Amino acid sequence: MIYDDKIFGDLCHKEFLVEREVKKLEEIYLEEVLPEDPKPEDEIEFTFNCPLKFHITSGKIVKDNREIYTFNIQERKTQWNDSIFNFSEIIKIKIPPLKENGLYQIHLYEMNEKIYEQYLSIDNFEAPLWSEESIIYHIFIDRFAKDEKEVEYSENLKEKLGGNLKGILSRLDYIENLGINTIWISPIFKSTSYHGYDIEDYFEIDPIWGTKEDLKKLVREAFNRGIRIILDFVPNHMSYKNPIFQKALKDKNSNLRSWFIFKGEDYETFFGVKSMPKINLKNKEAIDYIINAAKYWIREFGISGYRMDHATGPDINFWSIFYYNLKSEFPETFYFGEIVETPKETKKYVGKFDGTLDFYLFKIIRDFFIGKRWSTKEFVKMIDLEEKFYGNKFKRISFLENHDSNRFLWVAKDKKLLRLASIFQFSINAIPIIYNGQEMGCSQYRDILEGNRTLHEHARLPIPWSDDKQDKELIDFYRQLVKIRKSHPALYKGTFIPIFSDMISFIKETQEESILVLINIEDKEEIFNLNGTYRDLFSGNIYTNSLKLGPMSAHLLLRIDH
């Protein structure tokens, strides 16, 4: 079985990708920047695709409305494109180091007419060091815990059930005991719906989820336990009940009208959902409002960063502006995007985020462990190539399930597979997420795609807190797995060295340690020949010469004879 939650939508269809490529080739677009995230001391090379309807003659680098550098086109190359059955021009531009941190713009001209503008953040910002050691616990607030109690189940899962910040606070001991050091909370702002992704007020907490004092206390108590709090932030769209949108809707002459994208009486939305109008993030006032809101929760409450919802929605220039402004003031904060895209397109967000939720990795993990789509050789090769493609600077964040997908166990029907997939997830450099309840063995009652509908609420059921509803052995397994990862830097920042065999096998290595990862997903024993002496990080057993792996089993082996 190959299972697809359709998170990628049309991106998995070749016809869609070809059509998108055709549209892209009709406009000027930035194909590549080298280096990908330029520093002040770097010479920078830009590669643009230029269609036939344009002829780029010159350009400028601009900062704060001041011309910093002018250039003529240094290199032109003709390119044939089968997808449009026509030529286009590849333009390469090299500029000297810009020397100063700043938010720059590159302008391209045809004679005296500006025909293209792209923002570029030149800076020394990086993901904070604490992020590479992060193990993220993803909490869907409305379903997690209500004060010190369990959230009561309701047949109407589309209504707010009342999970709140006090509920998270009441479970901090549990989260700390798991070994978690970062919590990502779904949107807590005043909202029309139970999921919080349609915000009525970016500066207020929804009363059903708590108060600002509750948030301050949660951040303080969590930080005292070595746990950071990351919030879910939604810049692409807001609730139609937001007073800003209501004023724009009712008054065609309002300055707020330009904060949105009106077309006559209609307006652009989030995937056609009329209750979620899209924000025009090319409008300076709208941009400033969103940035100020994001800064507010960091400055006033000590938030450690944001998961940015629907990051492919806003124009990519917005992210250059947002990232530069936030990191300039709060360099130790962490920002990762919900970038549901191909790896090639995702990489264009380097320098605009610290990292991304890795949807490609999510898909191939589920396709392999549940769907048995790939051979072990193909799977290990894909992981190796993705590691090399992204490198370690742009942080990938891994997950086996989330609030928009079916639970892993709902699809796999096998806790052994969940354990094996989790061991793999915790053995690669991507920052791992545990979705609340995953560690307890939570599943669901109905498929989110039942009847060709999208029933996300069935992956968002209330979390069970009574002992008889939790798998204590599975919780203990996750606790041990978290401890192992945190104790061995090779697992979260080591070099990935593939070994092609009849099972998943690879080495994670730093100068200080080498760990051999072996995962057998077959229903038969496998033998692996060892080239040294190893200690199993789960059992403590010592192995030399060879190791017999039982069916559906895994070993994390620390080499001890160096």
Curated annotation (Swiss-Prot):
Matches recorded under SUPFAM superfamilies: (Trans)glycosidases
Keyword Nucleotide-binding attached: no
InterPro entries: Glyco_hydro_13_cat_dom, Glycoside_hydrolase_SF
MF terms (GO), sorted A to Z: alpha-amylase activity; metal ion binding
Keyword vocabulary terms for this entry: Calcium, Carbohydrate metabolism, Cytoplasm, Glycosidase, Hydrolase, Metal-binding
Chain sites annotated for binding Ca(2+): N236
The protein's required cofactors: Ca(2+)
Cofactor note: Binds 1 Ca(2+) ion per subunit.
Main location: cytoplasm
Active site: D309, E338
Residues carrying the site annotation Transition state stabilizer: D404
Leader sequence segment: none
Enzyme class: hydrolase
Subunit structure: Monomer.
Note: When compared to AmyA, AmyB produced larger amounts of reducing sugar.
Family per record: Belongs to the glycosyl hydrolase 13 family.
Protein name, UniProt field: Alpha-amylase 2
Native source organism of the sequence: Dictyoglomus thermophilum (strain ATCC 35947 / DSM 3960 / H-6-12)
Gene coding for it: amyB
